[in-house]
């Protein structure tokens, strides 16, 4: 029986077609409209910053990749479908109950929809996915040589960094396209009768056989190409059974030859498949395909497994030594840990020291950091916020400046930003929120090595940071900070941008509108005069931003005039990531005064995920420490095999200008991106001396490097394989922490030069593998003349690590008893600050841990911690007292504290101590009531007891006997209670 004529679809009326077109138009508008608005807004934003070439380059690349990938994949699928249709049999036998006939009729009635729609949908999806790989495309197009060749194939590393990922991407897309073409070709032949399954054997037309066999043959050839590329990817392979990255003995001597054998087998199988075109016999290609699958199991998997178990493992150290050496060399180069960067030096770690030796380490002892930037933010907020809408981040930053005497000091710094979420009541009105409260005001710096006065008890004044302020006030810029600042207004910053509606409307439109500061009698207003901002004076711009932010006030508010501009995307790191989308930014952004301007400094990294023999590292895992976990500031979950701090970026806090500087002049990855986006990165020579003085070694890179140094400091392959000399990053000993101890920025004596000059450095202790004893001390220099140089002090013996030191300090009887008295009855909350490890004297290590106390036991914002004690440990001895000098004297004797920093006077001076005493009074003694009324005998006796206990406490304090001192404080508390209750 012949094929039935196709059933006709009912025609739509004109009105129905119109409604359908309108509905489709609305859907397209809803889907594409927001994206078009976003694209136009980004075009304006990039233009305002001077980086429109970045926007256009990325956009053009994405569009071209989308079109090419979509047309290639869609075209191949369309070809598979079209050829099957055009070569369909003229006559197809059928019967009444043939289910295929119904599908055939349906396909013929919707031929254009199916024939064009399916390939178009597949091509569209392929293009959307492919355009996200624009980075890989640009690296391939502009890639260059590294100047280093891999040890196995002798290819330049640029092949693995820039070419191999592109080849694998193209191969994947072609393979998927051909496979989909095979599937649609097979289905089309089945529907249109080229393949019939009726009867016991079925039937296959000659043209269907030709097409299907050809497509299968092409797939086999593509598999051969994949085997060829697999050989190069072996050099970046990881195995759980080996402690290093890259091709090992089994990979080189079994897997690689197996890949060559599989290539040959794949080519033979492809020939066998193509033979079916002429032989009309499917047994040969079937045998070939089965052979290929069995070979991949036997040759590709079985043989390497045998070699691994019988040859490599029994003699693993000797067999793998050459490849371990390759991995050590490659990993060190990929992560910037080569011999020209890292200097190793033996260090005793527990050498005895006397007071004179400690006193001569003035660069260290005068800069002992007392302020913990993760703890003192509430104090900044309490004393320097001023208004409810100003705010400081929960974690402050560390930078260095010269003090008035020209000494290098580290400072806890912060910009006083506007926090839109802190606005209340009418302040939240749209006009106030976006046109009045637009900016922060001020830069606050506190010397990290000192506090205002001594706080012997949380209820006494003292122990707070000393604030140096740059701020606009009384019509002028008050510049009391460590450097002069001409413009303290902050329009751009991480706090001000941390809101769902991050924009401010500024510009001259009548009277000054923006809140600036207050005097005793008036509120001063201000109008933004910077170059930043996108003009929104035209109705087109107002309409676009009304759609962008879903806010009708852009159209109807009179506060927007012809000179108005909008500031948005105000997060410094996000601005850098936008203009340099090829960078990975550091999680720490910090403010600095550079050339009298307030700027945010951001570190940018170039990374690769493929580098022969280099260990792959997860940035989120490597950079996670107790601080990152506590503040939920984890790095992106990105795996890298190569990283360089290639770019230093600044964002002006006033006008938002973004400037990128080349930091690493030898990074081949950066050179590629400088060719992709010419003119966007300034040469390293453009970094001014003022900016160089505030560049610091980046935290995230340092944390990645210290984790790798834990393994890759080992030179001997045998020792590396046995892991016997590995190190560990210590856990944070603070009982409230739950991750690794963070590295610390400090000013101390120069470890690199091994002299007593002051140096700004990023440091970390390292433990022995699975032990709590110290193995090493790592210091990375941030000084301009030695920037990036890393010094590793290797420590033998059983020197206490951070955990053991913290345990010894916190469990010391004098310390625990004293702090128990201070925190008695949960009246005060005790918090331990950062535990610093400081090399001092000739081969010694000093642990320093500040102690803070605040009223109550909660973490409430109203609880302002202040420094109340300083604890130290040297070897097995504990030093403890209200000041650095007290703790040093307790450890090393008189004279050790001669270089220690003094205490700045408080605004409200506490009662004076007895003459010659360097410690504050123990407590305020109750005085007799005024007037002629005499004390009762019992009350007089209680007062005498108080005075006697105070004398005992002072005597114990002078002697440094903190056990007796703590006992006296407890007796004093009891005596005061007795005095108050006595009639």
From Swiss-Prot:
UniProt keywords, alphabetically: Cell membrane, Membrane, Transmembrane, Transmembrane helix
Signal peptide bounds: none
Transmembrane segments: 20-37, 63-85, 113-135, 169-191, 212-229, 260-277, 284-306
Domain of life according to the entry: Bacteria
GO CC, one annotated term: plasma membrane
Primary subcellular site in the record, as a coarse category: membrane
Localization, UniProt: Cell membrane
Membrane topology: Multi-pass membrane protein
UniProt cross-references to InterPro entries, sorted A to Z: UPF0182
Family the entry assigns: Belongs to the UPF0182 family.
Name the UniProt record assigns to this protein: UPF0182 protein ML0644
